[in-house]
């Protein structure tokens, strides 16, 4: 197992140019790509803020999930090659929004973005989601139960 804590990485999360003009990746982002390439199962654990992922996570994706690494456009074609095929993923998402509200009223925008627009676009499947909430009203016993559930999923490789 390899572990990345985005807050500990040294990188500029702002994508300042298009793909063709991108500067070289910082060493921590090179290592992140190596870790993703090495893995057969990816686990993303993060809070849901304003319906989606935190800005730092989005910046990480913008800088790491790149053409030539995670996908490849086909010259003159609408389709693309999914270079992360053969991998699965689990999203562990905490939230203060009640999960039924997030699903049925808001439409799960953050989950959909990660499942389809990021990981699915690159060939990662299946992408399973475990959500934990409402955090701010949860008891220590409930949070302990959530941690055990996440640990059980990890032990099962799911």
Q: PLM features: residue spans?
A:
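Mobile beta-alpha loop/short-helix "lid" or hinge segments that flank ligand
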Residues: 6-13, 82, 87-90, 116-135
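Short, structured loop/turn "capping" segments at alpha-beta junctions
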Residues: 67-72, 124-128
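N-terminal beta1-alpha1-beta2 submodule of the flavodoxin-like/Rossmannoid cofactor-binding fold
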Residues: 1-69, 137-158
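Glycine-rich phosphate/pyrophosphate-binding loop and the adjoining helix
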Residues: 104-158
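Short, glycine-/small-residue-rich phosphate/pyrophosphate-handling segment
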Residues: 72-121
């Amino acid at each position: 197992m390899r572990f990345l804590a985005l807050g500990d990485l040294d990188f500029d999360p702002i994508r300042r140019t298009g793909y063709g003009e991108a500067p070289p990746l910082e060493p921590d982002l090179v290592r992140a790509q190596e870790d993703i390439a090495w893995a057969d199962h990816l686990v993303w654990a993060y809070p849901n803020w304003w319906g989606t992922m935190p800005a730092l996570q989005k910046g990480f994706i913008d800088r790491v999930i790149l053409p030539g690494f995670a996908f490849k456009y086909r010259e003159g074609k609408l389709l693309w090659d999914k270079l992360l095929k053969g991998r699965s993923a689990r999203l562990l998402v905490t939230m203060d929004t009640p999960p039924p509200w997030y699903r049925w009223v808001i439409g799960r925008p953050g989950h959909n973005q990660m499942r389809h627009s990021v990981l699915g676009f690159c060939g990662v499947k299946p992408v399973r989601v475990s959500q934990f909430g409402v955090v701010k009203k949860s008891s220590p016993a409930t949070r302990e139960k959530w941690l055990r559930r996440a640990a059980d999923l990890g032990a099962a490789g799911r």
